[in-house]
Design a protein with these regions (language model features):
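Catalytic cores of nucleotide-sugar-dependent glycosyltransferases that transfer UDP/GDP/TDP-activated
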Residues: 1-272
Length: 272
């Protein structure tokens, strides 16, 4: 039987970033799914907290050199790679000096969110899609973990909907209880509107007068995973998911088997 291809795009991943629910859980997923017979590609931002020397990151010249446009500004995309400790899996890091050189992840040293977090999210999501196109590797599943990946379901279902490489992929969005998924305001909508997307395309991300990145991602994704215990499956943004499959939060000792069964059910639903 041909291996299923899983594209994992995450904002955080242990051991490169540590100390959050998402980094610790997502850090366990690659080896687990590889052991279950899945073929994986893993992408994440190269935040300034990632120790390049310790983790032996090096540039992938054939993938680097693209310019990613965000709100009519061009930003060079650099791709680096490292081997995930304890496995033969590789992690691809998306880097840009303006967005990711700083030695903090989403907030400054006073706890204030970076003003350009929306720009960084748009750059990362578009850059991830363009990188996978260069891979020439059509995934069966695209798992997007965390608010910074919340634009991926939108982009894949609109701006990139005619790309053959993504034609058969199911998009799964993982929502976590983090303090940044409501940030950005009108700046978010301005920066997120790549490739001539309109206000109508971005409307699902509106939450009253503000932003809900989880709500927008749930609207465009094929399935949703609840990654934090504090997020209940009855939260308002899940209403836009309709009858889409939802995997509720599960304690650590049940999470990995729960993921596996969830993915099996998604495979069966396509085959039915």
């Amino acid at each position: 039987m041909e291996k299923k291809r899983l594209l994992l795009i995450t904002q955080e991943l242990a051991p490169y970033t540590e100390g959050t629910d998402i980094s610790e859980l997502v850090g366990k997923l690659p080896k687990f799914f590889a052991d279950q017979g899945y073929e994986l590609r893993i992408l994440m931002p190269r935040f300034g907290v990632v120790n390049e020397r310790r983790h032996r990151l090096h540039e992938v010249v054939r993938l680097s050199g693209m310019n990613i446009i965000v709100d009519d500004d061009d930003y060079p995309l650099l791709i680096k790679v490292a081997s995930l400790p304890g496995s033969r899996l590789q992690v691809y890091f998306l880097d840009n000096e303006e967005f990711f050189k700083r030695k903090m992840v989403f907030e400054d040293d006073k706890g204030h969110p970076f003003e350009d977090n929306a720009d960084r999210a748009a750059f990362f999501c578009k850059g991830a899609i363009e990188t996978v196109k260069k891979f020439g590797w059509p995934p069966d599943f695209i798992m997007c973990q965390g608010w910074m990946t919340s634009l991926l379901p939108l982009y894949l279902r609109t701006a990139y909907k005619t790309e053959p490489i993504f034609a058969n992929a199911q998009i799964i969005y993982g929502a976590y209880d983090t303090p940044h998924e409501h940030e950005g305001g009108e700046r978010f909508f301005q920066k997120a509107a790549i490739n001539n997307l309109t206000k109508k395309h971005l409307e699902p991300y509106r939450n009253g007068e503000g932003v809900s990145m989880h709500k927008g991602a749930a609207h465009y994704a094929d399935a949703v995973i609840i990654g934090s215990e504090s997020l209940d499956t009855n939260v308002p943004y899940l209403s836009v998911a309709g009858d889409k499959p939802v995997l509720p939060w599960q304690p650590a000792d049940e999470a990995l088997p729960g993921y596996l069964e969830f993915f099996k059910s998604l495979t069966e639903s396509v085959a039915a």
